[in-house]
Amino acid sequence: MWRSFPAPQRPIAKTGFSSAWSKELVALLKNIRSSGEDALAMPGSIYGAIGLCQFMPTNISHYGADGNGDGVVNLFTVPDAVASLANYLAQHGWNKAATRAQKQKVIKTYNRIDIYANTILGLAEAQGYVAE
């Protein structure tokens, strides 16, 4: 796989086979290549999460979705970030008919903190998006 990278990037790509953090780096490099993003201008968390929905780079290939139909998954655009997060939640069991407890469990696959899941559900309920 690392041979598919241009020669100057191969040493970095090779590390993808030796450690957990390097898998995130390799996934990030692949995403940058396909999206055309500027790697030096790309903001991210101290843990490596990127985009409006703060996905780890390895999650982009699994859950990233092209929400605006431009053929590119760019988690820094609202349509793609929303579509990607919706895809993530759907693949983890979200459905409209689920109970509040089931929905909370799905949200906690994204962020394990109880207060986070309760806040998201509370905000959604206040806006009429989720049945109480």
Give the label of every model feature segment.
Residues 1-132:
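Catalytic glycan-binding domains that act on GlcNAc-containing polysaccharides
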